[in-house]
């Protein structure tokens, strides 16, 4: 019947009989009188078909129930007079030229559990749903949305209307978690990033606005100095180029408290300074925010896949790179050191970033902690898929859903992805 619905839907104004003929699945169907009621559609009158269509399928007239008792029926079967049933279907024929061979002798044939959609669904080990997505949102001080050239389909959202509209779209398809990233005016940037903890800054204002409109929305925030730093680094830079660790952590604590005070549900230190999780936890608790969670960027690698993100926020380092504080892409075991530290310091969620190039690290964390794992499908991963799809090199929907499924399969509980709304729409459509 799915074929019936698709054929009819693809032929505007068609009669159902035309659709049935077109799809060749009209066996067992008969014309019905033009009576409209639940599940009945006239085959003679043109119609606009709804998304779901129930067409009456009638084979033979249903026989009246037999007056015989259950005991009589059972006795007939025992006596060898079993009632007639449809014959066993003939085995489908192989194409001409197929060699005639004896079946392979093998007790285990894994394909048996894959032979139908129902069996595949029954034994599916990993699932994804909109509840698994966190939508990253870029915000700026302007009133209008501004497209991001390196991230087709993504925009810097005007902090009032654009932000609200995007969250409406997300919630409409079941995505109720967002993370905010600010594009800060250059005039507000400084070497110490003091704007990061301004209670009336862009992020605190966005948090208050969203909580006023959507009290149950889960708001994650980014805790780092790079959007606010005139140097473009995640920490305070000494004159010799060294990123100062402890002084930076002091600033991050004030930033996290300001975000929590505005109403953030989860603060997310992405800076990769040593000891920042424990210091932020202590600062939050002392400020009365014991219920605000920390999502630690535990294994954040110094990756080439961040390029489009830095364009979106204009947060490229003014000199050097971030290799003295972000992890070496060649390292695997080092992620366990960061995991144990963050867990001991009070992290509530552990993150791996990027996601797809580091599926092995996601699995490593999953096997070594009971805490929830998040993974960030970063801007470079997003833009790669979009570019390949635009060039006709792959099917965007299939590639996106497969990539997200692989991240979940590796062990991530939640995924930060720019595809959140689109993927949720696809998933919802599949369940209709």
Curated annotation (Swiss-Prot):
Subcellular location: Plastid, Chloroplast
Note describing how the cofactor binds: Binds 2 magnesium ions per monomer. The first magnesium ion is required for catalysis. The second functions as allosteric activator.
Pathway: Porphyrin-containing compound metabolism; protoporphyrin-IX biosynthesis; coproporphyrinogen-III from 5-aminolevulinate: step 1/4
GO BP annotation list: chlorophyll biosynthetic process; heme biosynthetic process; protoporphyrinogen IX biosynthetic process
Region Disordered, annotated ranges: 84-113
Domain of life: Eukaryota
Positions bound to Mg(2+): 338
Encoding gene, per UniProt annotation: HEMB
Recorded GO CC terms: chloroplast; cytosol
Residues annotated to bind 5-aminolevulinate 1: 310, 322
Required cofactor names: Mg(2+)
Pfam families on file: ALAD
Keyword vocabulary terms for this entry: Allosteric enzyme, Chlorophyll biosynthesis, Chloroplast, Heme biosynthesis, Lyase, Magnesium, Metal-binding, Plastid, Porphyrin biosynthesis, Transit peptide
SMART domains tied to this protein: ALAD (SM01004)
Source taxonomy: Eukaryota, Viridiplantae, Streptophyta, Embryophyta, Bryophyta
EC number: 4.2.1.24
Family: Belongs to the ALAD family.
Complex formation: Homooctamer.
Primary subcellular site in the record, as a coarse category: plastid
MF (Gene Ontology): porphobilinogen synthase activity; zinc ion binding
Protein name from the UniProt record: Delta-aminolevulinic acid dehydratase, chloroplastic
Summary of the function given for this chain in its UniProt record: Catalyzes an early step in the biosynthesis of tetrapyrroles. Binds two molecules of 5-aminolevulinate per subunit, each at a distinct site, and catalyzes their condensation to form porphobilinogen.
């Amino acid at each position: 019947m799915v074929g019936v619905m698709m054929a009819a839907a693809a032929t505007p104004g068609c009669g159902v009989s035309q659709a049935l003929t077109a799809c060749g699945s009209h066996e067992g169907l008969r014309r019905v009188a033009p009576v409209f009621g639940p599940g009945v559609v006239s085959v003679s009158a043109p119609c606009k078909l709804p998304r779901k269509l129930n067409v009456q399928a009638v084979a033979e007239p249903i026989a009246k129930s037999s007056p015989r008792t259950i005991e009589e029926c059972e006795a007939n079967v025992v006596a060898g007079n079993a009632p007639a049933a449809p014959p066993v279907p003939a085995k489908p024929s192989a194409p001409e030229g197929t060699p005639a061979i004896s079946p392979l002798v093998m007790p285990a044939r894994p394909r048996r559990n894959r032979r139908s959609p129902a069996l595949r669904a029954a034994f599916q080990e990993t699932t994804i749903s909109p509840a698994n997505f966190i939508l990253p949102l870029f915000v700026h001080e302007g009133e209008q949305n501004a497209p991001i050239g390196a991230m087709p389909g993504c925009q810097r959202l005007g902090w009032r209307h654009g932000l609200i509209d995007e969250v409406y779209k997300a919630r409409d398809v079941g995505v109720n978690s967002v993370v905010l990233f600010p594009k800060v005016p250059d005039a507000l940037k400084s070497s110490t990033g003091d704007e990061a903890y301004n209670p009336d800054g862009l992020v605190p204002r966005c948090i208050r606005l969203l909580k006023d409109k959507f009290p149950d929305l889960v708001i994650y925030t980014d805790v780092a100095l790079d959007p606010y730093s005139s140097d473009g680094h995640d920490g305070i830079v000494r004159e010799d180029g060294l990123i100062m660790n402890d002084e930076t952590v002091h600033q991050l604590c004030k930033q996290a408290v300001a975000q929590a005070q505005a109403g953030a549900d989860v603060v997310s230190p992405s800076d990769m300074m040593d000891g920042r999780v424990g210091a932020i936890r202590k600062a939050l608790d002392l400020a009365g925010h014991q219920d605000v969670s920390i999502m630690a960027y535990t294994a954040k690698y110094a990756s080439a896949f961040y390029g489009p993100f830095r364009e979106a926020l204009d947060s490229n380092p003014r000199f050097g790179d971030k290799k003295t504080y972000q992890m070496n892409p060649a390292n695997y075991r080092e992620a366990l050191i960061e995991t144990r530290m963050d867990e001991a310091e009070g992290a509530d969620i552990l993150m791996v970033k990027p996601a797809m190039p580091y599926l092995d690290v996601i699995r490593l964390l999953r096997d070594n902690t009971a805490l929830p794992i998040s993974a960030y499908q970063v801007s470079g991963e997003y833009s790669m898929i979009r570019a390949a799809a635009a060039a006709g090199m792959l099917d965007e929907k299939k590639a996106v859903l497969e990539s997200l499924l692989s991240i979940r399969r590796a062990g991530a509980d939640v995924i930060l992805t720019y595809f959140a709304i689109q993927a949720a729409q696809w998933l919802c459509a599949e369940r209709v």
